[in-house]
């Protein structure tokens, strides 16, 4: 380990013991991330501080830490792995906001809105580098070099899902939509537990964990799609996916319910990129059974995830149960709001 890494580790661990005698896992990981952000005299400092001032649910980090407690993984390794996945997730959010044009993130201005696209792009890149630095530290402590390959693989798949969305033309199949949804969401839900399992030498769980989180990720994405239409997703623009022609389960469900002539008319408008009739089509979609159909598909996907969960070991099942419950609640809330 290099001298700088040792100094950073010591400073972080001292700060935890000095400021919070019994900090939560979320606080520990958040403080670790803050301790590794650029200092005030460095570029990107203000943008990084703005973004991490509201850390969000930190679902991925807390899942990794819960796994570490249950499976007795080294805490120094686990905290760095949890932070690595969380930082990579945040890098993807910053880049997503640029791509999607979303102006808000966690109730505050998105980085690209407040600081400009160039700063947002470079901050996202910088955080990716930090993520791999933290993963390398975890791998060194746990003597598990495979962690870097896990992080790389999941980053690659997430990026591929995002890139596939750029080619979306509104007439792709449900299979294509679900591939995009799972590739964008599932990898960074899978990584926290997969890394913890690998640290204890459990390589058998990998395939089951992947299947489980792929279905869970699809269900979660459909819930987000429903929330996008009813304005409860935190984005400034209601039905923003429709405006920018982004893949959305509600839009696809609406198309499925149209007759041939109606489908042709909608597809012509959709492909044109015109937003003049956006409110009209939004009203048509909200007045249809599209939200209900999307909800039904979401719950069917959630049922598949529940089935895969039964194949998990008792220890891994204990780790993912809170996450499963959280996503079930998110799906139920989205469905309820969509029916309102």
Residue ranges, per PLM feature:
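N-terminal amphipathic/basic leader segments beginning at the initiator methionine
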Residues: 1-36
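Short, amphipathic C-terminal "tail helix"
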Residues: 3, 315-340
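Amphipathic alpha-helices that form helix-helix packing interfaces
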Residues: 12, 29, 212, 219, ...
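Non-transmembrane, amphipathic alpha-helical segments
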Residues: 17-21, 51, 173, 177-181, ...
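Mg2+-dependent prenyl diphosphate-binding active-site environment of isoprenoid biosynthetic enzymes
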Residues: 28, 34, 38-263, 328
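Short, charged, amphipathic alpha-helical segments
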Residues: 149, 207-210, 267, 296, ...
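Alpha-helical, largely C-terminal catalytic domains
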Residues: 188, 244, 297, 312, ...
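Mobile late-domain/C-terminal helix-loop "cap" segments
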Residues: 264-310
